[in-house]
Swiss-Prot record:
Compartments reported by the entry: Plastid, Chloroplast
SSB domain location: 1-101
Predominant localisation class: plastid
Keyword Nucleotidyltransferase: no
UniProt name for this protein: Putative single-stranded DNA-binding protein ycf41
Keywords: Chloroplast, DNA-binding, Plastid
UniProt GO molecular function: DNA binding
GO cellular component, one term: chloroplast
């Protein structure tokens, strides 16, 4: 397992579950984009967040938001084949930090003078 940082686009609504009544787990499906030889490659990513970070993620981040994630990376066998480019493995990240990058859900309003 390696510690790394990524910019991930959230593609599905985050799902929250609870363990032992108080421990929160939020799972996010996202895409990691790469550009190779002038081709855009989409890599599926599963992101898991625990505890208070899981609560904050459910509150602040939504579909089509881009986030910067720091965490431990692991490769798993591919579960589904619903992505455009076939990949035999997918990336799972256990997130320790998450930061907003481009939030689609923020509405900027004009202040009245």
């Amino acid at each position: 397992m390696n510690y790394a940082s990524f910019i991930i686009k959230i593609i599905k609504k985050p799902k929250q579950s609870f363990f032992e009544k108080e421990i929160s787990l939020t799972e996010i499906s996202g895409k990691l984009y790469q550009i190779r030889n002038k081709k855009k490659i989409e890599i599926p990513v599963s992101l898991s967040l625990w505890g208070n970070l899981a609560y904050d993620t459910m509150q602040y981040y939504h579909i089509n938001d881009y986030v910067i994630v720091e965490g431990y990376v692991s490769l798993r066998d591919k579960i589904s084949s619903g992505y455009q480019i076939p990949v035999d493995k997918h990336i799972e990240v256990s997130g320790f930090k998450i930061y907003p990058f481009l939030l689609d859900s923020i509405q900027l309003t004009k202040m009245d003078k």
